[in-house]
């Protein structure tokens, strides 16, 4: 179990490499949307691509586990904490690049930047095409790894290429080189997304803003965004909606410990204050079991689990 505030030999070793901000025994709950879970043995923010590669090389040589913490949305940290290295890429680690022509444009942003940054840069250059990503929490790196999206589109619809760091260096992969599917992508083993290039087009920015404003308004009305939250909890099964199935199973508003199935949207969990990762994971498991019993559907969690669960 990782103890908060305790500096281990690993944290000291990483500090000796230089080029990184290292926090030993750092509580991770404040860095996740659900505000639950334990601490990181070593939370590391690399200050350069070279420092990131050096970290990955150290981890490979010494058999140290590496976890990636993006924006903390849909991420559940175990109450026992996260051993090894927990990497968090700063949003400004890489410069933004805009290559905009008369009819189209390519935007390259760092993977540690929030998804909303893409939306803002897109609008600044009078580009359209990624409206469906507006309002999705998390980082661009997380959007790549989860192929984030809504009913109106998915990230890989507008991704042209991704840059990935491994212990052997940094290189670009085209979209064709990254297998992806609904809420999933397959990156090289041990790889960390560092930059993302988006292919967009010139268009009606007024209409684009209207679409995004409508989507954001709908989210605010139907999702528990004013509370520490976790969602969507499950991917939608083919031809149905996870929230409908959970509500049909009688679990909307159901609580386990201090975690509750949202009364606004049954495919979300909220932290009522003081919830543990055990509470949240127990509720996820219960939702899955009840829906299977009620409707015969084996729902797939849209959850990234990090660390040790007690």
From Swiss-Prot:
It is found in: Cytoplasm. Its main location: cytoplasm. This is UDP-N-acetylenolpyruvoylglucosamine reductase. It comes from Myxococcus xanthus (strain DK1622). One of its GO terms (cellular component) is cytosol. Keywords: Cell cycle, Cell division, Cell shape, Cell wall biogenesis/degradation, Cytoplasm, FAD, Flavoprotein, NADP, Oxidoreductase, Peptidoglycan synthesis. One of its GO terms (biological process) is cell wall organization. Its cofactor is FAD. Residues 35-203 form the FAD-binding PCMH-type domain. Its EC number is 1.3.1.98. NCBIfam families: murB, PRK13905.1. Signal peptide: none annotated. The active site is at residues 183, 232, 302. PROSITE patterns: FAD_PCMH (PS51387). Belongs to the MurB family. One of its GO terms (molecular function) is UDP-N-acetylmuramate dehydrogenase activity. Pathway: Cell wall biogenesis; peptidoglycan biosynthesis. Cell wall formation. It is an enzyme of class 1 (oxidoreductase). Gene3D superfamilies: 3.30.465.10, UDP-N-acetylenolpyruvoylglucosamine reductase, C-terminal domain, Uridine Diphospho-n-acetylenolpyruvylglucosamine Reductase, domain 2. It catalyses: UDP-N-acetyl-alpha-D-muramate + NADP(+) = UDP-N-acetyl-3-O-(1-carboxyvinyl)-alpha-D-glucosamine + NADPH + H(+).
